[in-house]
Amino acid sequence: MSRIGLRPIEIPQGVEVKIDEKNFAVVKGPKGTLEQQLSKDMEIKIEENVINVVRPTDNKKHKSLHGLTRTLLSNMVEGVTKGYEKKLELVGVGYRANKQGDKLVLTLGFSHPIEMVDPEGITVEVPSQTEIFVKGINKQVVGNYAAKIRELRKPEPYKGKGVKYANEVIRRKVGKTGK
């Protein structure tokens, strides 16, 4: 059984957390502001520089919402202080990425280049033609955008070509053997 919900969340200096009676959370920090509607079933208490999430009962639904609510708040606090980053790598001959204004242009072996417009609150950096950094304060948006880029050309198991996360290990397969 997970006990993540029981852990308190430290509020760093320079971060302001406001939660109204309907559990609408607003977290302001040095990198920006995040807003999110949290579960109305949970009771969120802010005492000095610590946030505690309390569940009303021990039924299964409340136990799962307890950990979720605590993690969402923790991600918001970490996002406005440190931010989030996903690194993607392009593996394959002729696979390239470059930036044109707010568009990411990918050449992934198709007959046409793929243009992707950066979502609001996300910055994309292309330090080299085979590296992409997706940065932002909202963990969910950063992860979703990185997953969309990876989905365009997933790594294949025979040669490992495609778009992969920097820390991802691709399980390789052995090709067919001739007679």
Curated annotation (Swiss-Prot):
Presence of the UniProt keyword 4Fe-4S in the record: no
Keywords, comma-separated and alphabetical: Ribonucleoprotein, Ribosomal protein, RNA-binding, rRNA-binding
Keyword Ribonucleoprotein included in the entry's annotation: yes
InterPro entries: Ribosomal_uL6-like, Ribosomal_uL6-like_a/b-dom_sf, Ribosomal_uL6_a/b-dom, Ribosomal_uL6_bac-type, Ribosomal_uL6_CS
GO biological process, any: cytoplasmic translation
Any Pfam family hit: Ribosomal_L6
GO molecular-function terms, A-Z: rRNA binding; structural constituent of ribosome
Domain of life according to the entry: Bacteria
Gene Ontology CC: one annotated term: cytosolic large ribosomal subunit
Quaternary data: Part of the 50S ribosomal subunit.
PANTHER family: 60S/50S RIBOSOMAL PROTEIN L6/L9 (PTHR11655), LARGE RIBOSOMAL SUBUNIT PROTEIN UL6M (PTHR11655:SF14)
Sequence similarity: Belongs to the universal ribosomal protein uL6 family.
Function: This protein binds to the 23S rRNA, and is important in its secondary structure. It is located near the subunit interface in the base of the L7/L12 stalk, and near the tRNA binding site of the peptidyltransferase center.
Protein name: Large ribosomal subunit protein uL6
Organism: Alkaliphilus oremlandii (strain OhILAs) (Clostridium oremlandii (strain OhILAs))
